[in-house]
Amino acid sequence: MPQVTMRQMLEAGVHFGHQTRYRHPKMSPNIFGARGKIHIINLEKTVPLFNDAMNFLSAVAQKRGSVLFVGTKRSARDAIKEEAERCGMPYMIQRWLGGTLTNFRTVKQSVARLKELELAETDGTFSKLVKHEVLRLRRESGKLQASLGGIKDMNRIPDAIFVIDIGHEDIAIKEAKKLGIPVVAVVDTNYDPSLVDYPIPGNDDAIRAVQLYARAAADAVLEGKAAMPNAAAVREEEFASAPDAGKKGRQAQPKKGKRASDAAAE
């Protein structure tokens, strides 16, 4: 599991919450106190919850599952894109499209259109079209790339989603909950941690904090992938654990023209 220390969290500003007047009552157990009018998050509570969340992501990846990284706010986009690409997972960094999960079949049609346009640009199709038509198709491709480029290779519903700001990504979380998809999310002092399966109490605005979360999530995924059982090893293990009768194979059949009793006597 990726090791992130309390000191690293302090240096990244994970402990700084929102203004005290915005406190959500259910976040109170995770709040240490206040400095001025800003709540201070208790990192002694954050660290074990953070570790639980990372262990879960690692377990998902180990079972060949996919994790959708979600961070559409400006402070999260770069880190989410970079780390999701590093660990080979899909991501969403532009405005969340309603129905991305709950209407995935339609989204896949839009993704197919994006791939079609990308192919047309590389295989010479565009060179056969008039200029204004090429410009129109490139604009269409650009819009699709901006909104769906991160999930272009996501062929099925993800096994989990990793979210930076549950208030900003409330639609994504509602869709995930509707489909029973586990949610790992950073939850600041102004939101309800019970809305997600694996809450991580922490600052959801500071760029350094977001980078820490995203990097740790990617490391957890890569660790899980590295621990995936080798397919050949699994087959060998299954064969070795088969009943002895299965190993012996079929009994020899009597040769043609001989009675079964004669064959047995031989």
UniProtKB/Swiss-Prot annotation:
One of its GO terms (biological process) is translation. Pfam families: Ribosomal_S2 (PF00318). It comes from the Bacteria. InterPro entries: Ribosomal_uS2, Ribosomal_uS2_bac/mit/plastid, Ribosomal_uS2_CS, Ribosomal_uS2_flav_dom_sf. Transmembrane segments: none annotated. Keywords: Ribonucleoprotein, Ribosomal protein. GO terms for molecular function: structural constituent of ribosome. One of its GO terms (cellular component) is cytosolic small ribosomal subunit. CDD domains: RPS2. Belongs to the universal ribosomal protein uS2 family. HAMAP family: Ribosomal_uS2_B (MF_00291_B). This is Small ribosomal subunit protein uS2. The lineage of its organism: Bacteria, Pseudomonadati, Pseudomonadota, Gammaproteobacteria, Lysobacterales.
